[in-house]
Design a protein with these regions (language model features):
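C-terminal effector modules
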Residues: 754-755
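Short proline/glycine-enriched turn/loop segments at secondary-structure junctions
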Residues: 731-733
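N-terminal export and membrane-targeting signals
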Residues: 1-19
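Glycoside hydrolase catalytic-domain context in secreted enzymes
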Residues: 3-4, 8, 25-726, 735-749, ...
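Hydrophobic membrane-insertion alpha-helices, especially the h-region
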Residues: 19-25
Length: 760
């Protein structure tokens, strides 16, 4: 599975660390230096590595959770600690490592800053809806600043797992179903996290995850097996990871899932051959939580009650050997490396060059991060760096940019601020759930509820909860307790008393994220019944959805005149949503993932491959569902409405042919034909109609979000090269085949305006 082309290796410049740690190069010898005559990072790494005992090397390969990290462990020289967020404790543990371990190697502290640290931004799936990489980069920039101020120098982000599975809860953490959009957003997050030099005081080390194809679990069930072809892996799932690596991501996290029978954290093909060798990645790979231990076979009676299950290792030593041989450099939580590493060396099941390579990678990142020069943080400044006004303002803008208007019949929106509003629903005055899954250190009180945001813009606003969505977890969770209908009469009365109604519906944050797979994608509980009863009042109403995945909205749309997809918007949820509802912000987001008509269509995605019998619901022997009148999703990838209207026209190609090293530029005009200033996302797709292996019916290759005043026209330009029209074959080789390439430009994946050129 070697490959070139779109996923080809690219060297990333990393700023040298200029201050030499005391005594690290003692012992003489010629040392490589940089242009200023100072020791290079690799020279410092090699000098330090030469002093280390086997035990010290294995300790560097150990990553502990906050609850495991003690002063004694720090003195042993552990490599990393995650989820500790108290700066005083971080300093204390760092002091033990730097002052009281033999070689004074600092600890790399890490945290899951997925969409914000204290200033929680929209979930990444929501930010992908902005089709604006600056939104993701700003989120990461502010998250890095707040995280680093606490003494944490690594973030387990970006999460770039492409997914076609709305049943899978972690779809909330990625950028949806498209490899190109996912790649653009992945690179933007890395740039925000690391900047040009991640040793800077306000920057952190990015860790791209979960490598690889974690977003394709069978049945959409968390942690489940992934099975896919080579061409699907290379064309669809790997590009966002590669984009993050090309952007400079210094570390990576391997995945829980098995890929074609080999677990991600013991997978030599993905970890060593692809990531390290083919892509030239010189950082380190950490395992996910107990993923090394989970390689073990579960015994009939599990006396230590430890993690196990994959069954490719008989015991702890076997698991450690499998992970090290696969390419996992650092073990999270479980301790098989430090417990059995020396035994495995003696038994020749692993080698010292493998250990040295892993430790060299870990030390390289620590030196580049400036930890040897600046291991400590000022606790008095940590709190002052959180929730700053510029961060809150940026979050409000990001949240409104990430919202998608799905329906707006009869100009139900924008709301009239001079008329009364009834906010109704279980999420209407909610703060907790607005932060979404992986809320960092965000606090419920940080968040602005929808009711508060609307009332700030229209004082004549009331709130009626109507029902509860309990934040309970299995085994205590019972779907029958979701949104009971006993208080619906109060909601109906409130609706009848108001001029306009806003229904705040969706999921709790506990229903989304890790370990939250759902078999049903309808609104939980009796929320649809609530919609039906409000619809029966005849009052104009809008459904605002707070959720972390695509939902089945067929019945919702049948009853609702307006639907706004707000996702989990973050700390400024209420204010940002009110900005959109009242028209202060014209919604311009587009869906980064398809919304199915029915859960039985899943997985459904726009860039699917064709069949010999394309769907025709009127023909029995075509690829269709007997009980559906369409093969399309309910809402397609790239879809989204506005309070104004746009027209995309005049598609032109600069050439009728593309030479092997040449390019073709596509231009199109986009005009605001309505009465309000607004944003349109112009999208370019291609199709290769005749190829040696089937090609997707559409592939997104470019997009641009533009702001236009009424009547204004702008010409957008997209440059296509062979990298855009080629593909990976069944052997993982990137090829560009001569022949026709169809270009489509429009406002969604259903674009119809088309021209063609010939690739030579």
């Amino acid at each position: 599975m070697r490959h070139l082309g779109l996923l080809r290796r690219r060297k990333v410049a990393v700023a040298a660390v200029f201050v030499l740690g005391a005594g690290l190069l003692a012992g003489g010898g010629v040392v490589a230096t940089n242009a200023l005559g100072q020791p290079s990072v690799d020279a410092r790494v090699n000098a330090l590595l030469a002093k280390m005992t086997t035990d010290e090397k294995l300790e560097q390969m150990q990553l502990l959770a906050d609850w495991q990290a003690t002063p004694a462990e720090a003195q042993k020289g552990i490599g990393g600690v995650f989820s500790q967020t108290d700066p005083a404790t971080i300093n204390a543990l760092q002091h033990e490592a730097v002052e009281h371990s033999r070689l004074h190697i600092p600890i790399l502290f890490a945290f899951d800053t997925i969409h914000g640290f204290r200033t929680v931004f929209p979930i990444p799936l929501g930010e992908a809806s902005s089709f604006d990489p600056s939104v993701a980069q700003t989120d990461a920039t502010i998250g890095a600043r707040e995280t680093a101020a606490t003494g944490i120098k690594q973030v387990y982000s970006p999460m770039v797992d492409l997914s076609h599975e709305p049943r899978w809860g972690r779809i909330a953490e990625g950028s949806g179903e498209d490899p190109y959009l996912g790649s653009v957003m992945a690179a933007a997050r890395v740039h925000g996290d690391q900047g040009s030099d991640y040793s800077a005081a306000d920057k952190v080390v990015a860790s791209v995850k979960h490598f690889a194809a974690y977003g394709a679990p069978e049945g959409g069930r968390e942690y489940n097996t992934t099975d896919m072809s080579t061409e699907r892996l290379f064309n669809m799932y790997l590009p966002p990871y590669k984009a993050a690596i090309d952007a400079g991501a210094a570390t990576a996290m391997c995945s829980f899932n098995a890929i074609n029978g080999v677990p991600g954290c013991a997978n030599q093909e993905t970890e060593t051959n692809i990531l390290k060798q083919d892509w030239g990645f010189d950082g380190f790979i950490e395992s996910d939580y107990t993923a090394v231990a989970e390689l073990r076979t579960c015994p009939p009676v599990n006396p230590d009650n430890g993690p196990c299950g994959h069954g490719i290792a008989a015991d702890g030593p076997d698991a450690a050997a499998a992970a090290i041989n696969g390419g996992t450099d650092m073990e999270m939580v479980s301790t098989n490396y430090v417990d059995f590493g020396k035994q495995l060396l003696a038994e020749h099941k692993i080698t010292m060059p493998q250990i040295n390579d892993a430790v060299r990678r870990i030390l390289r990142v620590k030196f580049r991060a400036g930890l040897f020069e600046h291991p400590y943080v000022d606790p008095s400044q940590a709190a002052a760096a959180q929730l700053l006004p510029d961060a809150v303002a940026a979050e409000r803008s990001a949240a409104s940019k990430s919202m998608v208007l799905l329906k707006n019949d009869n100009s139900t929106l924008p709301l009239d601020p001079n008329k009364s509003v009834a906010v109704i629903g279980p999420l209407g005055d909610d703060q907790h759930d607005m932060l979404g899954p992986w809320w960092g250190t965000g606090q419920d009180q940080d968040a602005v509820s929808l009711y508060s945001g609307i009332k700030a813009q229209d004082p004549n606003t009331t709130f009626t909860k109507a029902c509860d969505l309990p934040n309970t977890e299995p085994p205590d969770y019972n779907p029958a307790n979701d949104c009971p209908n006993t208080s619906f009469p109060d909601a109906v009365a409130a609706a009848k008393s108001a001029d306009q109604v806003v229904l705040a519906l969706g999921e709790t944050r506990e229903m989304s994220g890790e370990a939250t797979s759902r078999s049903n994608l309808d609104l939980p509980g009796n929320q649809q019944e609530l919609i039906n009863e409000i619809a029966a009042t005849g009052k104009p109403f809008t459904v605002v959805l707070f959720n972390g995945r695509p939902l089945t909205l067929t019945n919702v749309a049948a009853k609702s005149p307006a639907i706004l997809e707000a996702w989990f918007p973050g700390v400024q949820a209420g204010n940002a949503t009110a900005d959109v509802l009242f028209g202060k912000v014209n919604p311009g987001g587009k869906l980064p993932v398809s919304f199915p008509v029915n859960v039985g269509q899943v997985p459904i995605f726009y860039n699917h491959e064709p069949t010999g019998r394309p769907c025709d619901v009127g023909v029995k022997w075509d690829s269709r569902y007997r009980d559906l009148t369409t093969c399309d999703p309910f809402y397609s990838f790239g879809y989204g409405l506005s309070y104004t209207t746009f027209n995309v026209s005049n598609l032109q190609l600069s050439s009728a042919t593309m030479s092997p090293n040449g390019s073709v530029t596509a231009t199109a005009d986009v005009t605001n034909t309505g009465s309000r200033t607004g944003d349109e996302v112009v999208q370019l797709y291609i199709h290769d109609p005749t190829a040696s292996i089937e090609q997707p019916v559409r592939r997104l290759r470019a997009f641009e979000r533009v702001t236009l005043a009424p009547g204004q026209t702008k010409t957008v330009s997209f440059k296509l090269t062979s990298n855009d029209v080629g593909f990976y074959d069944n052997f993982g080789k990137f090829i560009v085949e001569p022949g026709q390439i169809d270009v489509y430009v429009g406002d969604s994946s259903k674009a119809t305006m088309t021209k063609s050129f010939t690739a030579q």
